Amino acid sequence: VVGRVRRLTGAAKVGHAGTLDPMATGVLTMALGEATKTVSYLMDGAKAYRFTVRWGEQRDTDDAEGTIVETSDVRPTRDQILAVLGNFIGDIEQVPPVFSAIKIEGKRAYALARADQAPEMKPRTIHIEDLKLLSVVDADHAEFEAVSGKGAYMRSLARDLGTALGTVGHIAQLRRIAVGPFDEKQAISLDKLESLRHSAPLSEHLLPVETVLDDIPALALTEIEARKLRRGQAVPVLPVANRSPFKNIRQDDVVCAMAEGRLVALAKIKGGEIRPFRVMNF
């Protein structure tokens, strides 16, 4: 996807905020040019998914593309499903799928698994902000919606839901419907992007880099202050803060340094100064 977007846009630098599973569809947030400097903020942001669990079959990949390794005749009822959802909300321990991009001693877990050297995956703490049952499609399938933090796997969630319900299960369908402030309404398909390059400026379909940083306080700079930050120099925070509606900025806070409505730099408040650590070269 990165290569195709680079070719279609002509951008020298292209980044993305989190991979999608091979069988997954939905939102993949792309950053072009200087916006790649903000990708880490999207990576740490919330992601929303809609997925269908197929009960009664466990697969080695925890999705429909894998080989069946265990079956069960148990099919949970709607009430049983609703009763366990609360156990999966908040900070929970989750074992990632063996077929994942996590590195184990320098090698991807999926590469080891394909070479019949499946590694032991260690549990890690992840955060599930919300988990809802949308519908019981039939005895074998249930549809869910989840909002998660960084590092959560819906395939593992489906597997663990099955275990909690006394059966087994895997992801039959998976769609990412939002990443941070971006959702499907703002998304554009690769095919449409291909067609637009011949008919309209792509810039009309790009969102400003500030969209990613909408939850970070913004400080308005004068042109002199902006020039200093662009050169990597710090500026005193007090005059800037006095012009800002944000009166509770603290030591080590990250701020967006702005000039004339454009992002100049991401900066930290240190020792009474605004110190840039990501300067934008627009």
Segments the model singles out, each with a brief description of its role:
Residues 1-16, 20, 85, 164-282:
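Accessory RNA 3′-end/elbow-binding domains used by RNA modification enzymes
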